[in-house]
A protein has these predicted regions:
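N-terminal lobe/hinge region of extracytoplasmic solute-binding protein
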Residues: 47-98, 129, 222-223
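A structural "hinge/loop" feature
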Residues: 48-67, 90, 117, 139, ...
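Aromatic- and charge-enriched surface segment that lines or borders ligand/interaction sites
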Residues: 93-147, 178, 262-265, 308
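Append "and occasionally in soluble cytosolic enzymes with long acidic Gly/Pro-rich linkers
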Residues: 228, 236, 310-407, 493, ...
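Detector for C-terminal structural segments
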Residues: 321-349, 393-402, 427-539
Length: 539
């Protein structure tokens, strides 16, 4: 659904914020004299490109859900705001056994959830059991529609599956939890920083689980973080401070220019997903543009279940037709760069074995001819009604890429699909269709190169219609490989295999950025989106 300025203003009014509508007669003094209710003065207002899909970060791969979950819940292991290294959060200490088959986590004492429940080892055990059985909670069809979830990625499968490396989670004492594995799980501590491993109160699950039968709900769960859920019913989600800090209102504003309008009229303090299209306006207005380090990937997915896309020459023609360097130069923020593999170099350096595809129109045309392509329609899907942090203005991205593909001889059929309620994600991941190509991407939360590759490519899925038994085997081995050099080589081999077989084409490692208003002194930017709102400072 397109969010008009009227919708934006209605959302602001629901917060008690006075809409500032620019007119020909409006003056600067009028704007400055606009009164705002005292209760709203302490509310920090953030514009984001889409609304969160759920209040439970364990049941979805949605970026906006995870962004807000970090404010309400805490993990056992956290991320240092300055270095990105792992730090104690709800677990004060952790110890592996000599053989790596057990992990003991010691919990903080005297921690209480927002609903009054005490943090104990039994509570943590219940959380692990919930994460490990989310496949049963969602059911097969919906599980397929949300993509591979973090518990399965980290442990190799769910608790009822043979591939799962986690065999038991027990409360060894009131504040010690012990995990037992069939083999040592590498990078486990880093993986537990993923927002999907947030600890919530089991006493708050019942209403959520009931609502889950009808879709991903926004029913509040109780955490231990600096915020609790406020109103989640509209396009604005409220976060209420638990320690007398500022409350936060997170407004879903899909349109880039409407987010800019919100900043200009002081209805927003910050907005995310800045695009080059408005960069000059931001700079000329004196706003601060806060850039994150590139730790996300935008890619073009290829559905090999589509009869035309089954031909490798066709997929190679797609790769050569794109001219990704020009796309980055014109549609991405400065500092973004072309991706030739899925992991950014800060996680995994590209090896010489990775096949690269330079823009080459003649090569693309010749490959199509060799494949016997005869103008069959190629459905190209892209999301509407929302943007992603890693994918601003998807319509423009689609137009550029579709133009390049058409020039190479493809018969491109545009297929805009609404993002609303996760429709785009569920349709791309779910039932078979005539989809040939689609735009998607990932924000990287776990600083381990295995994670992204395992999430996307370890298991056969309907997003790519691709199965590679060798890749599956190598990723499973890398999950438990203790020699870091050997493990790195394994993951380089997987990246090389993907570059040859082309289930998807990495487009760019984009610089993502926020814009902050004149009253913002400090905003805690983070490449993994661990941006703690309680640390925000006003001038």
């Amino acid at each position: 659904m397109h969010l008009s300025r009227r919708t934006l203003l209605a959302g602001l009014a629901s917060l008690g914020l006075a809409p500032l509508v620019p007119t020909a007669a409006a003056s600067q003094s009028t704007v400055q004299s606009q009164s705002v209710p005292e209760t709203a003065a302490r509310t920090f207002r953030i514009g984001v490109p889409a609304k969160a899909l759920s209040t439970d970060p364990a049941v979805t791969n949605d970026v906006e859900t995870h962004r807000l979950a970090r404010q309400v819940y805490q993990n056992l292991i956290g991320v240092d705001a300055e270095t990105g290294e792992t730090v104690a959060e709800l677990a004060t200490d952790w110890t592996f056994s000599d053989d790596g088959l057990q992990l003991a986590l010691e919990l903080k004492h005297d921690v209480t959830f927002h609903d009054g429940t005490k943090l104990t080892a039994d509570v943590v055990v219940e959380n692990f059991e919930r994460w490990g059985s989310v496949n049963e909670l969602l059911g097969e069809q919906r599980l397929r529609q949300v993509g591979r979830l973090p518990f399965s990625v980290v442990f190799g499968g769910y608790l009822d599956q043979e591939a799962c490396l986690l065999t038991s989670v027990v409360a060894s004492s009131e504040h010690i939890v012990t995990l037992t594995f069939t083999e040592p799980v590498q990078a486990l501590i880093r993986s537990l920083t993923h927002p999907a491993f947030a600890i919530s109160s089991p006493e708050s699950w019942a209403e959520f689980d009931t609502a889950l039968q009808d879709g991903l709900p926004l029913v509040p769960l109780a955490g231990t973080g600096p915020y609790r859920w406020g109103d989640t019913s509209g396009e604005t989600i409220g976060l209420e401070s638990t320690n007398d800090g500022h409350d936060v209102a997170v407004l879903a504003i899909p349109n880039l220019h409407e987010r800019l309008y919100g900043l200009d009229t002081q209805q927003l303090d910050v907005f995310d997903a800045v695009s080059p299209a408005i960069l000059r306006q931001l700079v000329q207005s004196g706003y601060q543009v806060l850039q994150r380090d590139p730790l996300a990937v935008l890619y073009l997915g290829i559905n090999q279940a589509h009869p035309v896309m089954q031909n490798l020459h066709v997929r190679q023609a797609v790769a050569h037709a794109l001219f990704r360097g020009e796309m980055v130069d014109t549609l991405q923020l400065a500092g973004s760069y072309v991706a030739h593999q899925f992991n950014p170099p800060s996680l995994l350096e590209r090896s010489e074995e990775v096949t690269t595809y330079s823009g080459d129109l003649n090569r693309a045309t010749n490959l199509l001819a060799a494949a016997g392509y005869d103008g069959e329609p190629i459905e190209f899907w892209y999301p509407t009604g929302a943007e992603r942090v890693y994918m601003t203005q998807p319509q423009k991205l689609f137009s550029y890429l579709a133009g390049r593909l058409t020039a190479a001889g493809f018969n491109i059929v545009a297929k805009p699909v609404s993002w609303d309620n996760g429709d785009y994600m569920s349709q791309v991941m779910g039932d078979p269709s005539d989809r040939a190509l689609h735009l998607f991407g990932r924000n990287v939360y776990v600083r381990d190169p295995l994670y992204l590759l395992a999430e996307l490519f370890e298991q056969p899925n309907r997003e790519f219609g691709w199965r590679n038994n060798a890749v599956t085997k190598v990723l499973a081995q890398a999950r438990v490989e203790e020699d870091s050099d050997v493990r790195t080589t394994m993951l380089e081999q997987v990246e090389a295999a993907i570059s040859l077989d082309l289930p998807a084409i990495p487009l760019t490692f984009p610089i993502t950025a926020l814009a902050s208003g004149h009253d913002v002194e400090f905003y805690p930017i983070s490449p993994v989106l661990d941006e703690q709102y309680e640390r925000i400072q006003r001038r």
